[in-house]
């Protein structure tokens, strides 16, 4: 029983430090913004960079952040979580690199931040299981 109580006390102390850890991640302590997820699965036609950019005036009064899908090239129409290039090709199923930059710029002018959805351990290959394209980092 004594061991159980010590374990519970340790957990309670750890939980007590969670608010301190959460506030140390760069967010203002009284942040009141709301984030919009600007995509859903297989939404590459509905959530093109140009379509999201055209909605900036409608979004600005209500949202401080827009979460957008990843922007790397994946070799075809997909959500892009099998991307081939992380650093050298930003032409994705959602539009071109220039359209992405334009959307981010417009959002910034309207006071909207942009957060990219990136799954760093997902990567597609060119031909087979281990044939990753080379990139310059």
Task: Give the ranges of each region predicted by the language model.
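Bacterial N-terminal signal peptides that target proteins for export
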Residues: 1-9
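Hydrophobic helical h-region of N-terminal Sec-dependent signal peptides
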Residues: 9-17
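Sec/Tat signal peptide C-region and signal peptidase I cleavage site
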Residues: 18-24
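Substrate-binding/active-site clefts of carbohydrate-active enzymes
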Residues: 24-137
């Amino acid at each position: 029983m004594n061991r159980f109580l010590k374990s519970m006390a340790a957990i309670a102390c750890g939980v007590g430090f969670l608010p301190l850890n959460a506030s140390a991640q760069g967010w203002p302590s009284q942040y009141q913004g709301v984030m919009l997820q600007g995509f859903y699965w297989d939404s590459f036609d509905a959530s093109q960079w140009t379509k999201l950019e055209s909605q900036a005036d409608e979004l600005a009064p209500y949202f401080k952040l827009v979460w957008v899908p990843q922007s790397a090239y994946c070799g075809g129409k997909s959500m892009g979580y099998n991307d081939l290039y992380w650093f050298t090709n930003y032409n994705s199923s959602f539009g071109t690199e220039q359209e992405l930059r334009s959307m981010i710029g417009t959002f910034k002018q309207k006071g909207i931040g942009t957060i990219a959805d990136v799954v760093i351990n997902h990567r597609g290959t060119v031909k087979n299981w281990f044939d990753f394209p080379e990139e310059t980092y």
